[in-house]
Regions:
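Conserved glycine-rich FAD pyrophosphate-binding loop
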Residues: 1-111
């Protein structure tokens, strides 16, 4: 299957730049198959970025799509700090419970 990949650089810094990537590919007859294909592309691209020492979030935050890579980017200490902040500011755990961080400190994983 042919995939067109477009990219542009944005937000240039001394130590790097933001690369925005768009994938174009034929949609499958079943929308679920199209979504699955896109998720696989995104997963492979995200893994490649993290393995190369890049970040996958930039100024837009993390969100559920990037949550599986949060610990790889922030490290165990970063996750511990985020959990401590959440527990301090939201001791009852009522703000988006179980979405990005859990009480065990691991990041969200899709079911």
């Amino acid at each position: 299957q042919r995939i067109l990949i477009f990219a542009h650089l944005s937000h240039m810094y001394q130590d790097g730049a933001s690369i925005y990537v768009t994938f174009l590919f034929p949609r499958a007859p079943d929308p679920e198959d199209t979504l699955l294909f896109w998720r696989r592309l995104k997963e492979r691209a995200s893994q490649t970025i993290v393995e190369a020492g890049g970040t996958i979030s930039h100024q837009h935050g993390v969100g559920l799509d990037h949550a599986p890579y949060l610990e790889a980017e922030k490290g165990h200490l970063g996750i511990d700090v985020l959990n401590a902040v959440c527990k301090t500011l939201d001791p009852k755990g009522i703000l988006n419970p179980g979405k990005l961080l859990t009480t065990t400190g691991s990041t969200y994983q899709e079911p």
